[in-house]
Amino acid sequence: MAPSKQYDEGGQLQLMDAERIEEEEECFESIDKLISQGINSGDVKKLQDAGIYTCNGLMMHTKKSLTGIKGLSEAKVDKICEAAEKLLSQGFMTGSDLLIKRKSVVRITTGSQALDELLGGGIETLCITEAFGEFRSGKTQLAHTLCVSTQLPIHMHGGNGKVAYIDTEGTFRPERIVPIAERFGMDANAVLDNIIYARAYTYEHQYNLLLGLAAKMAEEPFRLLIVDSVIALFRVDFSGRGELAERQQKLAQMLSRLTKIAEEFNVAVYITNQVIADPGGGMFITDPKKPAGGHVLAHAATIRLMLRKGKGEQRVCKIFDAPNLPEGEAVFQVTSGGIMDAKD
C-alpha cells in the first residue's frame, strides 16, 4: 500500500507511519480475504464490480441482492456468505464489548467550541448527522468548515482523513476552503487535494455516486462524507402525491446506503436537509417549519440538528433528536475562516 498522508501542527502534509495505516485497515476486512477461505478470485472480482469491497459491506447485503449479481448462483452466494461470517463476528456482543467498540468513534471539530460541546465533542463517525434549516442558516458553511477540520490530526480534534462531497445544489465553493484552511494553519492546496467532489443532477446519479465511493474508501483513509442537500433531487424528480410512495422508497434506499458507508468505513456522514411549511405547527408559532423527508429521513438520521438565523452573522444550533445527547442550544458565528464561536 502506498503511504498515506496527514498534517502536522503546522499544516504540512506528512507521511503516516505503518502503525497508523494498520489501525485504519483494522476498521474493515477486505473482500480479497475471502480467497483465503476458498472463494474463487473470479467471484471476488464480481463482488468488486458490483461495488462490494469489504466483508463488512458484503454482510450488509441480502442474499437476494447478491444473487442478482451476474455470475453468482444461490449456491455460490451461500458459500461466500459463510466464508465472510468466518472472518467477521456478526452475532451478539455484550454491552461492555460494544462500549469498547464505540471507542473507535472519532469526533470531528466543527470549528466552534460551543457547538462541539453541544455535540459531545463534534460530528461523530459511524452515524448520520443531519442539519436542517432555512436558507442562510449555516448548513453549507458548516459543511465547508468540516471539509478542512476533518483533515486535522486526531490530537487536534480532527479526523485525520479525506473528505467526499456530493453536491446536489451547486453550492460548494473551493475558494471558500482557502481562508478556512489558512485559519487552521493548513496548506490550502493540500486540503483541496484531499477533497473529492461530485455534482449530482438526479436522484439516480446521486445513488450511483454513493455506490462508486466504496472503492475509494476501501483504498484510502476517508473520514467524512457530505451530501448537500440530501432531499433536493428527490423533490425535483418526484412530484405530486401519486409519486410520494416511490419517492420515499428510493429515499430510504439511499439513506440505507449512507448508513452502511458510515458503519463499514468508520466515516462521519453529514447531510443537509431543507425545510417545508408545517400546517400543524401550532397557532402560537410564527411561520412554523419542519424538515423535509418525512418519517423515512427522521428514522435514518442518528443526530438531527436544527439551525436557524440569529443576530447578524450569528446562527443557533438546537439538538432536535439524538440518542446520547441532551436537548440544548449553541450559538456560533459564520466568518471568513468558517464556523467559530460567537462574539458578544
From Swiss-Prot:
SUPFAM superfamilies: P-loop containing nucleoside triphosphate hydrolases, Rad51 N-terminal domain-like. DsDNA binds at R235, R241, R247. GO terms for cellular component: condensed nuclear chromosome; nucleus. Keywords: ATP-binding, Cell cycle, DNA-binding, Meiosis, Nucleotide-binding, Nucleus. It is found in: Nucleus. InterPro entries: Dmc1, DNA_recomb/repair_Rad51_C, DNA_recomb/repair_RecA-like, DNA_repair_Rad51/TF_NusA_a-hlx, P-loop_NTPase, RecA_ATP-bd, RecA_monomer-monomer_interface. Highly expressed in spikelets. Expressed in meiotic young panicles. One of its GO terms (biological process) is DNA strand invasion. It comes from the Eukaryota. ATP binds at G133, E134, F135, R136, S137, G138, K139, T140. SsDNA binds at R235, F238, R241, R247, R315. The keyword Nucleotide-binding applies. GO terms for molecular function: ATP binding; ATP-dependent activity, acting on DNA; ATP-dependent DNA damage sensor activity; DNA strand exchange activity; double-stranded DNA binding; single-stranded DNA binding. Belongs to the RecA family. DMC1 subfamily. Recombinase that may participate in meiotic recombination, specifically in homologous strand assimilation, which is required for the resolution of meiotic double-strand breaks. Exhibits DNA-dependent ATPase activity when bound to single-stranded DNA (ssDNA). Mediates renaturation of homologous complementary strands as well as assimilation of single strands into homologous supercoiled duplexes leading to D-loop formation. Binds circular single-stranded DNA (ssDNA) and circular double-stranded DNA (dsDNA) in vitro. Catalyzes DNA homologous renaturation and DNA strand exchange. This is Meiotic recombination protein DMC1 homolog B.
